[in-house]
């Protein structure tokens, strides 16, 4: 019996855009610590049930997924990766201000605030 194994890479765990990497690089330079990496994570809370968070860290945990773009490293823990698989991390500047934006294909609903989401049609957005 012959089996065929597809060795082509599957879709990336996360997409880290050039705009996001450039802004993170700028923020790291302001901190004066080139060892910093950006961690993106998901936690319970927010008006849609789950929310995104960002933090600078030096250490990489053994089970972290790392994504590198233009010399900047993005870290994601395994639990958060379950919710962020295939998401795009971007940085946008516009009339509403400047912010990091996560385009998450796993979110079934999200709040207008942009930092809260649900994966199972959870709570609707309440006023902030």
UniProtKB/Swiss-Prot annotation:
NCBIfam families: iron-sulfur cluster assembly accessory protein (TIGR00049), PRK13623.1 (NF010147)
Known partners and oligomeric status: Homodimer.
Top-level taxon: Bacteria
GO biological process entries: iron-sulfur cluster assembly
Origin species: Methylococcus capsulatus (strain ATCC 33009 / NCIMB 11132 / Bath)
Role summary: Required for insertion of 4Fe-4S clusters for at least IspG.
Protein name: Iron-sulfur cluster insertion protein ErpA 1
This protein's record includes keyword Iron: yes
Family of the protein in this entry: Belongs to the HesB/IscA family.
Keywords: Iron, Iron-sulfur, Metal-binding
Known cofactor(s): iron-sulfur cluster
SUPFAM superfamilies to which the protein is assigned, alphabetical: HesB-like domain
Record note on cofactor: Binds 1 iron-sulfur cluster per subunit.
Entry binding sites for iron-sulfur cluster: 47, 111, 113
PROSITE patterns per UniProt: HESB (PS01152)
GO molecular function, one term: 2 iron, 2 sulfur cluster binding
